[in-house]
Curated annotation (Swiss-Prot):
GTP binds at N110, K111, I112, D113, G161, P162, S163, G164, V165, G166, K167, S168, T169. Belongs to the TRAFAC class YlqF/YawG GTPase family. RsgA subfamily. Keywords: Cytoplasm, GTP-binding, Hydrolase, Metal-binding, Nucleotide-binding, Ribosome biogenesis, RNA-binding, rRNA-binding, Zinc. This is Small ribosomal subunit biogenesis GTPase RsgA. It comes from Clostridium acetobutylicum (strain ATCC 824 / DSM 792 / JCM 1419 / IAM 19013 / LMG 5710 / NBRC 13948 / NRRL B-527 / VKM B-1787 / 2291 / W). It is found in: Cytoplasm. The gene is rsgA. It is an enzyme of class 3 (hydrolase). InterPro entries: G_CP_dom, NA-bd_OB-fold, P-loop_NTPase, Ribosome_biogen_GTPase_RsgA, RsgA_GTPase_dom, RsgA_N. It comes from the Bacteria. Disulfide bonds: none annotated. Its cofactor is Zn(2+).
Length: 288
């Protein structure tokens, strides 16, 4: 049978197969090798007397480290304009990480009750021509929540963003009573409350949402300098148009991306962040 791991606690994995959930252990070959099952994995299992064994882990489309979860297809990147104050650099880092992991994005601006339309203009300009969906929410009063719920279908969604923007409130508004506290899980599964617990997939609206926020580390050092340009979707239409095929859209003459910035077709703040990140990668990787 094929299913998906929705929970992992102390060496036990809970695999959802259609409408059933099976408690499984992993074959020793996984424990001895470098590949260990994690939440989000698509797996083949055999079940004998109601107990399952994971026989195969299917290839992953991606793997997040914090939290450890695989095959994530969608991210709700949550920010506020005030309380805490919006940071375009921080948002850009989240966007790069999602692009790198091939995760589609919805940028969610929470606490819109605290701002007026004028304060929302900079974020709209920042994301102009990027293709990213921009949603305005008030998670406490559930404004905009239904639309997000509709996008959960057939996705594994992670919620991420800086501290204090209302990620937990948003997740509770979306998942409602489906969200289980650690103690509840421990009681249900008859395991100790201090048992090591990893992420869990909560089933909502025909999809899954990861119950712990994603991307706790925003380090970009692992990205190749020459691949950075591929993580900015507003650059795509200029691929192959620059004078030099190796153009990284920095100081080269005949760069169509720089021309687009000058003409206002690419947001200059996003471009400046790109150049700054490019230069940091150059120094760290000794490309200069």
């Amino acid at each position: 049978m094929q299913g998906i791991i929705i929970k992992g606690i102390a060496g036990f994995y809970y695999v959802k197969v259609e409408e059933e959930i099976y408690e499984c252990k992993a074959r020793g070959k996984f424990r001895l090798g470098e590949l260990s099952p994690i939440v989000g994995d698509k797996v083949d299992i055999t079940v004998i007397n109601g107990k399952g064994v994971i026989e195969k882990i299917h290839p992953r489309t991606n793997k997040l480290i914090r939290p450890p979860v695989s095959n994530v297809t969608q991210a709700f990147i949550v920010f506020s304009i005030v309380n805490p104050e919006f940071s375009s650099d921080l948002l850009n880092k989240f966007l790069i990480l999602c692009e790198f992991n091939n995760i589609k994005v919805k940028v969610c601006i929470n606490k819109i009750d605290l701002v007026n339309e004028e304060l929302l203009t900079p974020i709209k300009n920042l994301l102009n021509n990027t293709g990213y969906e921009l949603k305005f929410l008030n998670a406490k009063s559930k404004i905009g929540i239904n639309e997000l719920k509709e996008s959960l279908k057939d996705n594994i969604t992670v919620v991420c963003g800086p501290s204090g923007v209302g990620k937990s409130t948003l997740m509770n508004s979306i998942a409602g009573s489906n969200v289980m506290k650690t103690g509840d899980i421990s009681e249900k599964l008859k395991r100790g409350k201090n048992t090591t617990r990893h992420s869990e997939l909560i089933e909502v609206a025909g999809g899954f949402i990861v119950d712990t926020p994603g991307f706790s580390s925003l380090d970009l050092n692992f990205i190749d300098r020459y691949e950075l340009k591929d993580l900015f979707p507003e650059f795509y239409e200029y691929n192959g148009s620059c004078k030099y095929s190796t153009c990284v859209h920095d100081k080269e003459p005949g760069c169509e991306v720089k021309k687009a910035v000058e003409e206002g077709n690419i947001n200059i703040e996003r471009y400046n962040f790109y150049v700054d990140t490019l230069n940091k990668l150059s120094v760290r990787r000794n490309y200069k």
